[in-house]
Amino acid sequence: MLALLIAAASQITVYAQVEFTATRDAFQKSYIQEATGDYTGAINALKEVYDEKSYELNLRLGWLTYLSGGFTESKAYYLRAISLMPYAIESRLGFVYPAAAIGNWSEVIAQYEKILEIAPNYSLALHRLGLIYYGRNEFEKALKYFEKVVNLFPFDYDGLTMLAWTHFKLNNMREAKVLFQKALPNTPGGSSALEGLQLIK
């Protein structure tokens, strides 16, 4: 009986090693094919070893199907990855790409807000939410996100200029001018900050 158990355990170990090697090789093949623009080949390489319970496979397939233009399929892979690891940020950031590509901005906003629940100071989500609301002319909403970005990164050119433009749109010209000026030591030839200062004169 003991000999049978040892043999079974040994067989499982060998199978797991073979499975690991096949998965690793499939990932490597997918990276090579992605680099050449063969997204279909990259996807097929991973589908040969696909396991719906694998976070990594779902994450990678979400990216590759997005690149190939399969936005609905991409969202499904990313959602599966999110369900497997709900506190992971990278899968939520990935989901945003196909959602934005099909114009589903409510889903984009929901994912960024969820990221901020998980990591309240995640500057990329803060900045992108600010950009979305700025683009919608919802400047008061944009303001709170850009303010937080600048508080976290006071010398960041993009954060400073977007906060400056938001103040400009809200007719807070003094604040806008100060922020445009603060942005220029970072990027002395920054066209956005220079344009803003020119408009305020």
Where are these regions (language model features)?
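Structural signature of tandem alpha-helical TPR/SEL1-like repeats
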Residues: 35-44, 68-80, 101-114, 135-148, ...
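Structural marker of alpha-solenoid helical repeat scaffolds
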Residues: 50-52, 84, 118, 152, ...
